Amino acid sequence: QIVIFQKNVASDLDAPAVAWRVIKYCGQGDNHPFTFPLGLQVGASDSHGNCTPQLEAQYGQQFQMAPSTAGDRLTPAGYGASSKEVQVLNALPQGAINASCYKDGRLLAVKTAIAPRQKAVFEFKPSIWIGVASHIQQGQIMNSAIVSQMNTEISLLGISRADIVMRGGGSGANSRPFSFSLENVVMC
């Protein structure tokens, strides 16, 4: 399986990564088209297991999970401290929340157990990480041992479209490690 993810550079180095996209059974000579949009969405869940709808987010924007007469709600709350980040503030009087960041409607990153008056901060470089792993599901939080084996970072800065080419694999003495590179790059 081919796993594609991003790293939240606003978090500590040990922050868990989420398998944003998992490509299965892609045979030799096959391709698997996908888009990597610029936009993000955010969502949150409270300590009661209630989940908010995903809201469109722009870098620099802050959101807050706050009580309302209809229950806990996630709403835009102006701008955060940095134009490179999306922030989710826990404005509930009690109870921790989880904040999630999505790209193309798929889970991209998560920050758990955010206490009242604390916030989750999401910041991503314009790059993806890609590698090969088994038994990973899309949206799964990956442990650091798996992430450390996926060390190919591909910068998407200024790229409109490209092909990611995978080489390597096979069995026996002639097998080679998997590698990934960009080809047929079209710049913006």
Where are the language model's segments positioned?
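Intrinsically disordered, low-complexity segments enriched in small/polar residues
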Residues: 1-188
